[in-house]
Structures are given as C-alpha cells and as structure tokens.
C-alpha cells in the first residue's frame, strides 16, 4: 500500500510538470518546472515534519520553522539556543 501511495504521488508530480510546461500559465513556472518538481518530490519523500517555533529550544537551524535560525540572543556561548529570526 505504501509503494502504491508513493507511485501515485510521483505520477501526480510528473503530470503537474507536464501540464505546467504545456499550459500558457506563468512564465516563471515554465522556466523552473524541474526545480519545483524536485523540491516538491523531496518534501513528499521526507514526509510531514514538525518545525520548532520561535523562542523554543533547538539544536540546529534545520529544525526551526522558516525564516528562523537556531541561535542565542544573550551570550555567544550559551547552552540553550532558541529559534529566532
């Protein structure tokens, strides 16, 4: 069942690329269908990921929500960095 779900997702991404390339839609989308498809497929393969919100303890930048970095605001060598803008 899991393999079938994955194949359906891949087919959906490929069909979306095909439609975007052949449609008269946005030129930006026409120029970058492969890049978009690659990022989307990569996200689908990783699955749903919870991000760490602002001002919550973190260990590295990748776990923070978008536009946030894992850093300290008080001292450079702190032991408890948090996700901050």
Swiss-Prot record:
Keywords: Disulfide bond, Pyrrolidone carboxylic acid, Secreted, Signal, Toxin. The keyword Signal applies. GO terms for cellular component: extracellular region. It is found in: Secreted. GO terms for molecular function: ion channel inhibitor activity; toxin activity. Contains 4 disulfide bonds. It holds the Pfam family Conotoxin. The modification Pyrrolidone carboxylic acid is found at residue 50. Expressed by the venom duct. Residues 24-49 form a propeptide. This is Conotoxin Cap15b. It comes from Conus capitaneus. The lineage of its organism: Eukaryota, Metazoa, Spiralia, Lophotrochozoa, Mollusca.
